[in-house]
Each structure stands twice: as C-alpha cells, then as structure tokens.
Amino acid sequence: MGEPKPVNFRHELKYLISSAEVTMLRTRLSGLISLDAHAKNGHYTIRSLYFDDYDDRCLLENENGTDPREKFRIRMYNGSADRISLECKRKERGMTHKTSCPLTREQTEFLMAGKIVPNVADRPPLLQKLTAQMMTRRLHPVVIVEYERIPFVYKNGNVRITLDTNLVSSSDVSQFLRERIPHRPVMPLGQQLLEVKYDAYLPDFLYQSLQLSDLRQTAYSKYALCRRYTR
C-alpha cells in the first residue's frame, strides 16, 4: 500500500466589499490571471445544502470561532443535478481543508429527506462519515445557500480568488434539486463577498491587485448568515 496523502490545509481570507468594488476587481484581475475553466459565461451559480444537529452546534461553533470545527454540505452548480458532491469543510488553526465525493441524485434525495443512504458500507468514506454523524449527532439538512461566483485562478501558490454576489437562502430544503428555488436575499443592498484562497503563499502582484481603500478581513460565514435570516 502507498503512503497516505498529506492533508492539505489552505489559507482562506474573506472580505466584505461593495458591488462597485466587485466590478473594479473583476476588471483588474481579468488582466492578470485566468477565469476558472468552469465559468463558461464568466460566472456560475453555486447552491449548497448545509447540515446541522438539533442543537445548532455547527452554527454555534461557527459564530464562537471554535477550533477545530467542520461542517457538511451538498453542492450543485447552475441549478443542474448532473454534478452533485458531498463536501466536508474543516477549519483548524486558521486554515481550511475540504474533502469531497460525488453523489447520485438518488443518494442526494435520501440525504435531503434526512434519511440514511442504503448500502452505505459500500460508499465513499466521506459519505460513511456523514452517515455516522447523522446517526450519532442526528445531523440533518437545515438551509439552502445560493450565490453567483466569479472565480479567478492562478497556478503558482494554488491561488483562487472569488467574487461572490447575490447571496440568497431558503429553509425549504425539499426544493434543493429544483432548477430554481424560492429564496430570500440575505445581504444588505450592494454588499458582496471577496474570498482569497491559497496554499503556502499569495504572490505579491496579486496581493497588490486586491488593495482597496477600506478592505477589511472578516470572519464572515455564508452559512451562519443564511441560518439567521431563515429562522
């Protein structure tokens, strides 16, 4: 057997920005680095279904800055069920690590209903892990989070810079697989989100390109905000 792969934790910085700053950064970054190949029209829509227990432990850990902490979500793109994945995002010592595995539509429907996927012993380890926590902690789906993402990538440093706009949420988790879902906006008008992710270092020219007059790092969480707005 080969050696296990090392767990790759990444830096993840978040900033609240204005819609005008989104336009400015999009123009600036377009002249420096490439759009993600999956952004066929310059952007794509991300929809995530998050899990929590009946004590809202994931929400409270997020708001309290508990370290380490992790949360599970199911993710799809552009309202299409052709590509669905289960993800677990772990935060530890200020760094983040994400693991994922594909899901079928049938598996997703079981999880949406808070049910255990059949024959889970034959499934990927991540799905087995979620199943165990559904049984022991009673994890269940609690909120849908959706937004549009403009993603830029740069190979050196494995950099990913994203401009996330039009954040909306829904507590009707049964609608997750529909092409369009009923939702409500959760951000103040004109407020958007910048995320910067990288491995060991952020190239200086990219750091300089991100400088805005009042850019301030935040511990902002899409999940926590959407939970608060959909209660």
Q: Over which residues does each language-model region extend?
A:
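Phosphate-end processing signature that detects enzymes handling 5′-triphosphorylated RNA
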Residues: M1-R231
